[in-house]
Amino acid sequence: MKKIFYILSAALFIGCCSAPVEQTAEIQVIGHRGGRYEVDENTLSAFVESYNNGVRAYETDLRLTADNELVITHDASLKRTFGVDVDTEKLTRAELAQYKSLKGNPVLFVDELAKFFSDKEILYVEWEMKSNNYTPKQLKLYCDKLYNTVMPLKPEGALYIFSSFDERAILTMLELHPDAECMYITAKPVCDEVLAKLAELDVRRVGCTIHATSRDAMKKAHEAGIIVNLWPGKCVEDFQLAYALGADIACSDVPVAVLNFAKENMKWIKTSKDLTLK
């Protein structure tokens, strides 16, 4: 299987680079939940460790606590990562602060992570809004608090993206903060249906599944000015496939392994990219 991906990458490189090798290909590698197969996902320890190992772009997830604080967690329950079956959205910040992950790390909150990033050489952070069960009133509070917490602390030159599977969250964020950069996430591959949804939302960033995404679909998306993030990225081979398909962003659970592999074996690739909309 690995040989297939080597061939894919080499073929794409040869086909695209009849000019000198200086025409480096670019793809932004981001650490999914900090790089969840390499670190204690979505804890401060995860981001510190991956940053110290060269990662400069991230995805993370957030939910609203019972006292309207923003907590960093993918699952509503802490059972999988902390070993306790409690609902983060039904507890206060003070109550959540009592828990330690299975690896001994405390619950992380958005203001703490934003502060950590504030003086770092961060290129890109995707703040994924977990909001499917929120009322319109909660959504407004959630989006406004998120924007006002992270944007004042954004490092100069960094790109902060507000993303969600919940299109209501995207529309609410844009209503409250028209300058916000938003991304729609879907479990579908890049396809006409997804491109139509982006047009409906008036958003030009999308996170799609790498499975069943084709080069033709990627070409069509890029012709429409869409920036594409392909996921999941469970291994180095998934990164190679994302690159071969022409992704702008590869969302990876093993970002350090990907960066090291690319440095040693895919020297024509720059693992960062200007992701501003043109």
What residue ranges belong to the model's regions?
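Phosphate-group recognition and catalysis centered on beta-loop-alpha active-site segments
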Residues: 16-278
